[in-house]
């Protein structure tokens, strides 16, 4: 149990997808203008990562891994296309659920919801799972923790950006300029966790 708590804390803070690996920056910067929208997208990313990482773990372990289907047959060259297909299917299902049950959130997320399919934070989580050889339970914990870490980062950035609307930002830094500086400072804050040994 201690191992799983350690993995959860590590994936949320120490190896934060957005602020340590800078994955998922497109949607991270574009949707982080309002806390409500950021929270909605963050929940969507948590759901997709929590489902995609363990599901792709099963696909990799029982179909693609060297010797999984037939001894001596390695289908790992199909990793990218298979993982993206699984992620795309999950995002499509999530999009239909949001459209049906949460129309305001669906409309607020707009084009960024289908872009979760190609969000490199999602694919990065799946790739790290394969690279680190996590088992099924570890992949559930890692997927959930990575999603929560990404959501924590985007909601924090959205809160800061909402407060910055009322700040006196120099004209040359308004918009993305001050946002990049803010993200850099947030990343420095999360970098302080890098020395933590769990």
Swiss-Prot record:
Oligomer status and interactors: Composed of six subunits; NqrA, NqrB, NqrC, NqrD, NqrE and NqrF.
GO CC annotation terms, alphabetical: Gram-negative-bacterium-type cell wall; plasma membrane
Function: NQR complex catalyzes the reduction of ubiquinone-1 to ubiquinol by two successive reactions, coupled with the transport of Na(+) ions from the cytoplasm to the periplasm. NqrA to NqrE are probably involved in the second step, the conversion of ubisemiquinone to ubiquinol.
Enzyme Commission number, as recorded: 7.2.1.1
Compartment(s) of residence: Cell inner membrane
Matching PANTHER family: INTEGRAL MEMBRANE PROTEIN OF SOXR-REDUCING COMPLEX (PTHR30335), NA(+)-TRANSLOCATING NADH-QUINONE REDUCTASE SUBUNIT E (PTHR30335:SF1)
Alphabetical keyword list: Cell inner membrane, Cell membrane, Ion transport, Membrane, NAD, Sodium, Sodium transport, Translocase, Transmembrane, Transmembrane helix, Transport, Ubiquinone
Transmembrane segment boundaries: 11-31, 39-59, 77-97, 110-130, 140-160, 176-196
Organism: Aliivibrio salmonicida (strain LFI1238)
Molecular-function GO terms, alphabetical: oxidoreductase activity, acting on NAD(P)H, quinone or similar compound as acceptor
Membrane topology: Multi-pass membrane protein
Biological process terms in GO annotation: respiratory electron transport chain; sodium ion transport
Catalytic activity: a ubiquinone + n Na(+)(in) + NADH + H(+) = a ubiquinol + n Na(+)(out) + NAD(+)
Name of this chain's protein: Na(+)-translocating NADH-quinone reductase subunit E
Family: Belongs to the NqrDE/RnfAE family.
């Amino acid at each position: 149990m201690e191992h799983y708590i350690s993995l959860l804390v590590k994936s949320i803070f120490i190896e934060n997808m957005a602020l340590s690996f800078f994955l998922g920056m497109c949607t991270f910067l574009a949707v982080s203008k309002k806390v409500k929208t950021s929270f909605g997208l963050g929940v969507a990313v948590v759901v997709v990562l929590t489902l995609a990482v363990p599901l792709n773990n099963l696909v990799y372990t029982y179909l693609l891994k060297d010797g999984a289907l037939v001894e001596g047959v390695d289908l790992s060259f199909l990793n990218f296309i298979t993982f993206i297909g699984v992620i795309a299917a999950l995002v499509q299902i999530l999009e239909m659920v949001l459209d049906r049950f949460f129309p305001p959130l669906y409309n607020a997320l707009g084009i960024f919801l289908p872009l979760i399919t190609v969000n490199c934070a999602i694919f990065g989580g799946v790739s790290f799972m394969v690279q680190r050889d996590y088992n099924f339970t570890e992949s559930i914990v890692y997927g959930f923790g990575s999603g929560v870490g990404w959501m924590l980062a985007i909601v924090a950035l959205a809160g800061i950006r909402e407060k910055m609307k009322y700040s006196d930002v120099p004209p040359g830094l308004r918009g993305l300029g001050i946002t990049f500086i803010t993200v850099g400072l947030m990343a420095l804050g999360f970098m302080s966790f890098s020395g933590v040994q769990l």
